[in-house]
């Protein structure tokens, strides 16, 4: 299976545990609707220090998500469970990634932990 066999609930639990281990607060959001994702990104402005995002298939199609990430100007890290670069040619462009400081792909759930740790370090260095 491209995305593995673990459940979305297991992923949420993993992210919460990874954030707690790193000593950071996390708010989780998931939607299959592009506009709702844009709204969530915009809502992060002034309330979050950074964003970890898996834009899924919108990675390759959504200029709206790219624009929202640019507009809020928060450091963002892109995560993909699978190695998108080894997949179909149409998956080679990441619009969201153009607004991100780092991308993790092909690491499964571990990519989220790496993204949290990277973002924490990035913010600490930026605020030093």
Give each language-model segment a name.
Residues 70-87:
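Short, acidic/small-residue loops that bind anionic groups at enzyme active sites
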Residues 105-128:
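A charged, well-structured terminal subsegment
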Residues 1-22:
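Glycine-rich phosphate/diphosphate-binding loop of Rossmann-like nucleotide-binding domains
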Residues 25-35:
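Short beta->alpha junction loops
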Residues 44-51:
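Short acidic/histidine-rich motifs immediately flanking catalytic phosphotransfer sites
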Residues 43, 62-71:
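Short Gly/Thr/Asp-enriched flexible loops that form oxyanion-binding sites at enzyme active sites
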Residues 56-59, 82-84:
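Short glycine-rich anion-binding loops that position phosphate/pyrophosphate groups of nucleotides
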Residues 91-109:
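Short beta-strand elements at the ligand-binding edges of bilobed clamshell
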